[in-house]
């Protein structure tokens, strides 16, 4: 990456070869990375006495960043666009990139332990305000860059791989990672005022419902978050389902046993309140405010002082709920 930044013209003619070599090495290293960090609990981000990184996760991170940078090179784009013309979503190189991204975007054992005991850390990662740049976040960025260049093929490629993933015997981490990558892509769509197509949006509904019903809290939380993101970026495509998704999130706040899921549902409420018409959200204003108030009342206020991201999520969701109809909020005060 440093050589490329200093001598871009020198590396540009070789960018296609470098891209292919990087992709190949990432594919070869994936089983080792999965064993060390996703199935086992190897220590990551280690440096030697000279401050030089030497653990595998650093190499993966550099190669994912370099692969993303190569996607902007004209020789790489020309070759990949030509290949894509003769490919279907089932066998396209875009779908293969999605497979690679999902593999490296899986929650590591270290992250699982941290997020399970501190939802504030989870929220800071979710909102991308943390300085902890990991292979998981790099995969999200890779898919975002690909989506900016090839929007429809990226959406279709991710949907195609997600279908294959959910119809197989893969564990919850891979299924969560596929929805995480989608969530990152939808977040970028929201930022640039872009929408996902109705057919693709509908194609994810069954995976979201499946995720919401699973015993693993991380997959369950991801299902609620993606349901909100998809509602926000799909226009009217999910209008008939959005109310039930909103109500499911509202019901899970007091009833789900996982604090991670409860907080994810509170965050997802923001997406619904921003996207759905007043006629849908107004009848639910009081229940939403009550759910947030009850969640807050059950927390240790001394611990909340150190949970900035959690407090921001609570305040922003409460703000959006109040703005539905400020007259009702005034009545609640008195």
What spans do the regions from the language model cover?
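Karyopherin-beta/Importin-beta family HEAT-repeat alpha-solenoid scaffold
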Residues: 1-333
